[in-house]
Amino acid sequence: MATAAASAREQLREDERPGEPLHASFYARPVLEVARELVGCVVEHDGASGVIVETEAYHESEPACHAFVGLTERTRPLFGDPGRAYVYRSYGIHAMLNAVCDEQGVGAAVLIRALEPLTGVERMRARRGMADAAESELCSGPGKLAQALAIELDRNECDLREGPVVIRARPRAWSEPQILVSERVGITKASELPWRFSAAGNAHVSSPRPRALPS
């Protein structure tokens, strides 16, 4: 599959091609920094990829984060090595992809909320069962993007540098995205925190659309 992914990247314009997989040191920083800087990076898995256009930060200090309850079997990955995936199922239905951040022993992660499809779009359509849908509908939410990329719970704790889920550095076309900062959505606790980061004006972000000034 790595060969197929490399072949797909070669078909892109030079300024669309993502950089190298992000090193663990990228993630070993405060979660708010990582959440902002992941916007514009590229997620690859199983023959498809997309540019991250929306993220949310979660930290053990606030009650919307799974790590708020402390170390349990479920939350153990959140306290582990930065740069690994934390994948869980929401409401028993949708897989959610997160990148573990901060120092080992600190429970923090970035939820990948939306992607702009880059390669493997027809695979995404088939996986979503949406043959005629607009591209902007394919990955405009965390459950949608996991389904489009065929990410399931068996990817929990995978190394995001080595794969099979890989996050790569921003393509040149995304070197300096304009970022909107707004409140997190879809949660009932600590929803007032401005920990949602999205690419300004991008059609692929999730609903409700962020309403904030660039910062």
What are these regions (language model features)?
Residues 2-215:
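Conserved, well-structured core segments that form or line functional sites
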